[in-house]
Amino acid sequence: MKIAKVEPLPIGRYLYVRITTESGLTGIGESGAWGHLEASATAIAKFGAYLVGRDARPIEHHWNVMHRSHHFTGAAITGAISAIDIALWDLKGKQLGVPVHELLGGAMRQKARLYAHVKGRTIDEQAAHVSALRKAGFTAVGHLNPLLDENIEEPYFRAHARKMRDAIRNVARLREAAGEDMDLCIEIHRRLTVPEAVTLARGIEPYHPMFFEDPLPPANPDAMAWVADHIPIPIATGERYTGLHQFQTLLARRGAQFLRPCICLCGGITGGRKIAALGEAYDAQIVPHNPLSPVSLAACLQLGAAIPNLAIQEYPSASPGADGSAVLPAHELVTGLDRPQDGFIRIPDGPGLGIELVPGIEHREPVRPRPIQMRPHVDGGVVDQ
C-alpha cells in the first residue's frame, strides 16, 4: 500500500491531512496545533516528502521516524505527526475493511458518554444552556468556566475575595441548573495561581464537580501536583501536552486523576494509546480533549472504543437552541458521524475512522486564520482567558 500523495488541507478553522495511496485509497487526519496551523501545515508537507513512495502500513515505524528525525519537536510538529498518524490508521482500516478500533484490540464499548460544551459571558447564559442540554438528554456538561469568558478586549482586574466568591456562587448556580443527575466538568483555562486554585477548589467541593480542569498553566507538574495534594476534588489536565513523557512526569507526581490527551496533538492514535496504557497503570481515567472538528472526534471515539479507562468524551457542541439541540461545529464537513442520543454517541463502525470528508469541501470552505490575541490586564500586562 504505497503512498502517492500527502496533502495538508486547511478548511475553515481546521487543518486536515489527506493521504492518498497509489491505488486511490484515501485516509484523513487532523492537526490539533490550532493556534499555529500554518506552521503545522508546513510540517505536514515536509513529512509528506518522506512518506511518498513508502508503504503506509508500518505506522509505528513512521511514527518513530517523524518523532526522532531532526531531534526537535513542539506543538506544530506533533500536530502534523498526529494528523498523519490518524490518516495512516484510517487508511489501514479501510484497506482491511474494519474500523480502527478493531485494529487496536476490538471494541470494549459501542457508544461513548459525552459532555457537551456550555458557553456564555454571563452566568445566566451558562445556566440556561445547562438546563437546555439537560432537557436534551445530556448527562454531563463541560467547558464550564466559573470565571466567565468576558470580552477579551476589556482590561481585566478582580480583587481576590470577589474573584473567589463570584466563581463559587457561579458553580452553585450551575449545579442548581444541572440538578443531581448531570455532572459538571469545571474548566478554568489555566487562569489561577496556586493559592487561588486551592481556595476555589475547596469552595466548590459541596457542588461535586466531576473534575477541576487546568486550574494552572500545565508546564510545571510539581505545582499541579501540590494543588492536587491540597484539594478535595480531582484534577484533569494534559490538553497542551505533546507527548508521552509529559504525562509520565505528571502521573509520577500524582498531579492529576483525569488525563486530557489531545489525539490530534499528542501523537495521534499511536500516541494516544500509549498515554491511555500509561494512565491505566496509574489508575487514571482518560478524557480525550476535543475542541476541534468531527475528524478529531472520530479519532477520539476509535481510540476510546478500545481502552478500558475511558471516562467521558468532550463534545464541542455549539450553544444549544431553544429545543436543547447541540450541533457539532463543522458537522457539515463530514459524513458518517451520528448525532448524540441520551448523552451518548455511537462509535462509528465503518472502515477506518468510519467517516469521510465531503468531496470538494476544501474548495467551498474558506480558511479562517486565528489572530494572536490576549486579554489585557489593567496594569498593562496580559491574562489568560
Over which residues does each language-model region extend?
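Structured beta-strand/loop patches that form or line metal/cofactor-binding pockets in enzymes
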Residues: M1-I28, G32, H331, I372, ...
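Conserved, mostly hydrophobic/aromatic
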Residues: I3, G24, F47, I84, ...
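Glycine-rich phosphate/pyrophosphate-binding beta-alpha loops
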Residues: P10-Y14, E30-L37, I81, H117-R121, ...
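Metal- or metallocofactor-binding catalytic centers and their adjacent structured scaffolds
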Residues: T20-L96, D384-Q385
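Shared catalytic-loop signature of beta/alpha-barrel
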Residues: T42-A49, P58-H61, R202, H208-F211, ...
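Glycine-rich, aromatic-flanked loop segments that form ligand/cofactor-binding clefts
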Residues: D85-R121, E125, A136
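Metal-dependent enolase-superfamily TIM-barrel catalytic cores that perform enediolate-based chemistry
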Residues: K111-A225, H230
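Extended hydrophobic packing segments that form well-structured cores
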Residues: G352-Q385
